[in-house]
């Protein structure tokens, strides 16, 4: 008694995933957030594989109808090998999805590295995206209008060039 039936439990809701159809001025859009345990970037190849499967299933040969968006923390983007593996495979025939939009948040919780000189060997966490020549847009997350502008630029870039881009 006193419990909500079907209520989600746990402290991090994105662990459970989410899926919904949203009405937009351009029509209905399906949005899916894959379940993601606290193993940070391990969801990246899962999302990319899911997108590729959906594209193949609906005959989306130009890779424009299903678009992967990955959210990253700054320390995990530059520090976890699964990111580099996903980037490396992104341009191959079997794994190509027409480009992924990567959004990196400097969440300042790369807590195992208190000294910036222990965090990485590059100036920016986004430098690993140079391996596929992905453009990088740096934006101040405290300026919501500029963040929206950066997302618009990234979306247009992905639509025109069918390649990864990083914000």
Place the predicted regions along the sequence by residue:
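An acidic- and aromatic-residue-enriched active-site/binding cleft used to recognize and process polar
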Residues: 73-75, 105-108, 141-142
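A short beta-strand-to-alpha-helix junction
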Residues: 117-121
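Conserved beta-strand scaffold positions in the cores of enzyme catalytic domains, especially
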Residues: 102, 136-138, 166
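Conserved internal helical-beta-strand scaffold that buttresses enzyme catalytic cores
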Residues: 1-69, 75-101, 110-116, 132
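Hydrophobic/aromatic ligand-binding patch that stacks against planar heteroaromatic rings
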Residues: 92, 128, 157
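Conserved thiamine diphosphate
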Residues: 123-150
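Structural signature of the thiamine diphosphate
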Residues: 146-167
């Amino acid at each position: 008694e006193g419990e909500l039936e079907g209520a989600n439990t746990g402290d991090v809701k994105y662990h459970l995933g989410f899926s919904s159809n949203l009405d937009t001025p351009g029509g209905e859009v399906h949005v899916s957030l894959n379940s993601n345990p606290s193993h940070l970037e391990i969801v990246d190849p899962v999302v990319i594989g899911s997108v590729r499967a959906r594209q193949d299933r609906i005959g989306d040969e130009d890779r424009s109808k299903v678009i992967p968006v990955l959210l990253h923390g700054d320390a995990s983007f530059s520090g976890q090998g699964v990111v580099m593996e996903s980037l490396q495979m992104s341009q191959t025939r079997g794994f190509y999805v027409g480009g992924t939009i990567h959004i990196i948040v400097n969440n300042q919780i790369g807590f195992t590295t208190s000294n910036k000189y222990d965090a990485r060997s590059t100036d920016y966490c986004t430098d690993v995206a140079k391996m596929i020549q992905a453009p990088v847009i740096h934006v101040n997350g405290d300026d919501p209008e500029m963040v929206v502008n950066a997302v618009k630029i990234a979306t247009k870039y992905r639509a025109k060039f069918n390649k990864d881009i990083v914000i």
